[in-house]
Amino acid sequence: MRLKTILSIIYINLKHNILKLQNKNPNPYKILINLTDLCNSRCNFCDIWKIKPKNEITMSEIRKSFKGIENDIYWIALSGGEVSLVKYFYELIDFLTQNCKNLKIIAITTNSLTPNRTFEFARYIKNKNIDSHITISLDGDEKTHDKIRGVSGNFKKCEILKKKLDEQKINNCYGITVSDANYDYIMSSGNELKKFKAVTFVHSEGIYAKENISADEKILNAMKKILYHFKIDKLQDILEYIHIKIAIKFLEHKRKKNIIKCDVLNSSIHIMPNGDMKPCMFMESIGNIKLENIQKILNSKKTFETKKLIKNDNCPKCWMNCYSPHSIMQNPIKSIYQLFN
């Protein structure tokens, strides 16, 4: 990630902190968009692939929904389902780069089942002079990963995509979802765990569309093992290191306590495939971009009521790395304390 991008993200977070101290309500600077429920994986911890996509957001609806907030957006995260299955991807990137003058990062999460297409998507973003970040979902060694993801040969396609991205110097990393299914792999691994630079753990509902049976004792121990081997190679890795440390404390508190305040709806919003706009994937919709634009929804009574709930810690409590970096940056002192505590 380029230095000017890092400085821009630091700037917008400082600006948000100052505005909040003045009791002002800045617009979110990050939008996460789940473009589709369509998915070609068959993950054992997620049932989204069983959903038959219907009434999903269109490029036209996205275009209309951004009216009035274009200059507030610094960071876009695209996911699914599987992003590489979205037909209007190039049109979307053109729209974002042409209209959001402060846009610095476009992030994609992918299962890598179509490595050539995903690589072309990533290269297209890079050619727009925007920092891209591609997270390649990888949950273990070949046997473990392909079993979890339900598709034979998926592991090798992850390796193909990573090699192509590395050769073109496109920012990317392996991201692991910790569960009881890859517990044995994690606990029997050592330095190999250093390759994982994005770390989350299984949840229920939200984009998982499934109630997962809790195996938090195993997940907690696996997270500790990953933290022990985590290597900070780049400046942005510090955020992930803090994320993992707080995730461990979150799990130690049985997922019932936010270790630092959640900042969703202030720094970020989440748009679902059906157009529902949410603070995060686990909370109620505050509006729908098929019916109203983002700015109008942000100005609504329901948004302000939901912000109060979040401020008072009345949220589902998830500590997912979709949202945690922004909570960390909006609570720098408490986050640094957690880093050394």
Give residue ranges: language-model regions.
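Radical SAM enzyme [4Fe-4S]-AdoMet core and its adjacent flexible, acidic
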Residues: 128-278, 282-288, 292
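Short, flexible loop/turn elements at secondary-structure junctions
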Residues: 82, 110-112, 140, 176-178, ...
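Residue-level signal for well-ordered alpha-helical positions
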Residues: 46-49, 121, 148-151, 292, ...
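Soluble, non-transmembrane catalytic domains of enzymes that act on hydrophobic metabolites at membranes
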Residues: 30-55, 59-61, 75-79, 172-180, ...
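Conserved alpha-helical substructure of the radical SAM core
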Residues: 3-131, 331
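Cys/His-rich zinc-coordinating "finger/knuckle" motifs
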Residues: 46, 50-54, 269, 287, ...
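Alpha-helical membrane-targeting segments
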Residues: 1-27, 228-254, 328-341
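Flexible mid-to-C-terminal extensions adjoining Fe-S/redox cofactors in radical SAM and related proteins
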Residues: 27, 259, 276-341
